[in-house]
């Protein structure tokens, strides 16, 4: 309405001016007015292109940092270069590595006594271990070969093959989950060993390399980061690290001078809700409880 009123008043002014000059420039003014009206009308009638809706980016939730409390200290054979650890019905099953020293063991927790043992050939370097449907699955490092054992006897049942290196191994109850030292985790069919899917693990958008021993706990994947005192908790759906678990101070003093004798070995007792960790050639195995990180130094072994 305001725009129409503006055009009408200016038209009247122009006609009045032309009357005083004898309508000398009437035709020119009419042309100019027509152009003006046409341009303004075009501005009014031309639909505006809708603006794209701006959706603010949702920041990735920050991973929480956890520390630990030691609830119990158990004996552990310091000759075992721990590569995989499982607890089932009160018994530990452990994969010990190194060429010429690799084995699968059945261990009584309180005493640390090895109840049964199955040795690997000297050309195999044992790695991750998991129990699924009454069978123990054990990886080897660079040999692309795994072994299946009866859990009660540790008698070998069969072998299987995979395309990557073998580092850590766990299960979500149906598939095997394998790490190969990179930031990629592989879900394998336990029958065919075909890759069902794979997930890249990241922390704040950056890849997390050297994923080693694995444990699946109540829908979350836990992984040792090789050569560190850190365990990461991973969302298996997208590979995002949701917690950093700082186990600084847990490594025994006698293992500090040896670069390779690091934290490695996670076992969760789902029947009793107990979490155990150990390391390569460590003299102890620890039951721990995860707690929010405190600025103070984490609890150290007594």
Q: Where are the regions a protein language model picked out?
A:
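Conserved beta-strand positions in repeat-built beta-propeller and related beta-rich domains
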Residues: 93-98, 136-143, 178-182, 223-227, ...
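Short coil/turn segments that connect the beta-strands within blades of beta-propeller domains
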Residues: 89-90, 133-134, 173-174, 218-219, ...
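Short loop/turn segments that connect beta-strands within beta-propeller blades
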Residues: 108-112, 150-154, 190-193, 235-239, ...
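Signature of short aromatic-glycine-proline-rich micro-motifs recurring in repeat-based ectodomains
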Residues: 82, 211, 258-265
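Beta-strand-rich domains and repeat architectures in extracellular enzymes and scaffolds
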Residues: 71-103, 119-130
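Surface loop/turn motifs at the tips and blade-to-blade linkers of beta-strand repeat domains
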Residues: 73-78, 118-122, 158-163, 200-206, ...
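A short helix->beta-strand "capping" segment at the edge of beta-propeller domains
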Residues: 58-78, 111-113
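Bacterial signal peptide processing site
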Residues: 44-46
């Amino acid at each position: 309405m305001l725009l129409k009123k503006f055009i009408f008043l200016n038209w009247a002014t122009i006609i009045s001016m032309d009357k005083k000059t004898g309508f000398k420039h009437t035709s020119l003014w009419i042309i100019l007015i027509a152009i003006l009206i046409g341009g303004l009308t075009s501005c009014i009638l031309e639909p505006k292109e809708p603006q794209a809706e701006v959706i603010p980016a949702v920041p990735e939730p920050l991973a929480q940092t956890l520390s630990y409390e030691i609830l119990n200290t158990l004996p552990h054979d310091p000759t075992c270069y721990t590569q995989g650890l499982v607890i089932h019905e009160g018994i530990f099953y452990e994969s010990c590595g190194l060429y010429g020293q690799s084995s699968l063991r059945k261990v009584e927790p309180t005493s640390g006594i090895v109840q049964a043992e199955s040795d690997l050939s000297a050309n195999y370097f044992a790695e991750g271990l998991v129990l699924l449907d009454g069978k123990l699955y054990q990886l080897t490092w660079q040999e692309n070969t795994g072994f299946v054992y009866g859990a009660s006897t540790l008698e070998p049942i069969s072998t299987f093959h995979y395309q990557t290196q073998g580092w850590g191994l766990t299960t979500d109850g149906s598939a095997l989950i394998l790490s190969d030292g990179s930031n990629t985790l592989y879900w394998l069919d336990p029958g065919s060993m075909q890759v069902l899917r794979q997930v890249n693990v990241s922390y704040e958008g950056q890849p997390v390399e050297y994923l080693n021993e694995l444990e699946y706990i109540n829908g979350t994947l836990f992984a040792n980061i090789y050569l560190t005192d850190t365990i990461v908790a991973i969302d298996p759906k997208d590979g995002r690290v949701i917690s950093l678990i700082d186990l600084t101070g847990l490594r025994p003093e006698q293992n500090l001078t040896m670069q390779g004798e690091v934290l490695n070995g996670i076992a969760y007792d789902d029947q009793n809700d107990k979490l155990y960790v150990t390391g390569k050639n460590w003299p102890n195995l620890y039951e721990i409880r995860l707690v929010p990180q405190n600025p103070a130094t984490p609890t150290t072994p007594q």
